[in-house]
Amino acid sequence: DNLICDSSYNLGKRTHNGLSEYGREVVKEMNRVGVMVDISHVSDDAFYQVMDVTQVPAIASHSSCRHFTPDWERNMDDDMIKRLAENGGVVQINFASYFVDQASKDTKAPIDADVAKYIKDNNLDPTDYASYDEYRREQYDKRFLYVSSEKVADHIDHVVNLVGIDHVGFGSDFDGVGY
């Protein structure tokens, strides 16, 4: 969570139950000055509250369809995609394997847990990425389920079938997700 809204990654107690009052003002100001509101990373409650506040189309710059990853709040469910389309917005499909395929997502958590254990067992600083990157890469190369472009296309087709081609785009997240 931050000062603006709750995060989809915070699975514990949410700070604002969606948007904070400050967040509502931020959305209004973004509308006023012509800045697009990006709802990737926000909690479901924050998403719907942004949709209620914004007067211009919003985007999900790098999200995918929860239809294929049911327990992944970071992705959008069908009702959210419909609401975003009603707003004139676009969902830009994230290419990361664990965003587009549940089986891939299921391989990620055990690897991440093993990497965390490696960091702890070797007294490494978790913020010193270089100190454990080689180990992390080895683990992902051996154990992670990478998916094909067909899985990404399934998400695109799902959005097109749900709300039309005008409301889907590409949002690779390649600068932050390499698998």
Each language-model region and where it sits:
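Extended C-terminal subregions enriched in glycine
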Residues: 90, 94-96, 140-149, 159-162
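Aromatic-lined glycan-binding groove of carbohydrate-active enzymes
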Residues: 77-135
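Short, well-ordered secondary-structure micro-motifs
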Residues: 50, 70-72, 102-104
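Active-site-proximal beta-alpha loop/turn segments in soluble metabolic enzymes
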Residues: 3-15, 26-33, 59, 64-65, ...
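Histidine/acidic residue-rich metal-binding segments in metalloenzymes
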Residues: 10-59, 73-89, 150-166
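Intrinsically disordered, low-complexity acidic Ser/Thr-rich regulatory segments
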Residues: 128-154
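Active-site beta-loop-alpha junctions enriched in small/polar residues
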Residues: 1, 35, 40-47, 63-66, ...
